[in-house]
From Swiss-Prot:
Lipidation, O-hexanoyl serine type: S29
Annotated tissue distribution: Expressed in the telencephalon, hypothalamus, pituitary, intestine, liver, spleen and gill, with expression strongest in the intestine.
Entries under Pfam families matching the protein: Motilin_assoc
Family designation: Belongs to the motilin family.
Residues where lipid is bound covalently (O-decanoyl serine): S29
Gene Ontology MF, one: G protein-coupled receptor binding
Modified residues (Methionine amide): M45
Name of the protein this chain belongs to: Ghrelin
Protein species of origin: Carassius auratus (Goldfish)
């Protein structure tokens, strides 16, 4: 009986230790170049260079649409509001309105 008990305790201990151990597998990257599988195609030579992106030319009739949540706050004195109020209102109507822009 004591031999069976000792064997069962050893078995449980080995099972518990196996849960704590991480398994590691060596992939093809660990192999030397002579042992690597040759299933891959060699890299293509003479690839075309990526052309530099062109800078877009902005024309007068181009329209840019943008919709994003944002917060806009402006602090003006009464004199500044008298001077810039109509222009500011026109800018806000153009930004927040659905009609085409008017300048």
């Amino acid at each position: 009986m004591p031999l069976r008990r000792r064997a069962s305790h050893m078995f449980v201990l080995l099972c518990a230790l196996s849960l704590c151990v991480e398994s590691v597998k060596g992939g093809t990257s660990f192999l030397s170049p002579a042992q690597k599988p040759q299933g891959r195609r060699p890299p293509r030579m003479g690839r075309r260079d990526v052309a530099e992106p062109e800078i877009p030319v902005i024309k007068e009739d181009d329209q840019f649409m943008m919709s994003a949540p944002f917060e806009l706050s402006v602090s003006l004195s009464e004199a500044e509001y008298e001077k810039y109020g109509p222009v500011l209102q026109k800018v806000l109507v153009n930004l927040l309105g659905d009609s085409p822009l008017e300048f």
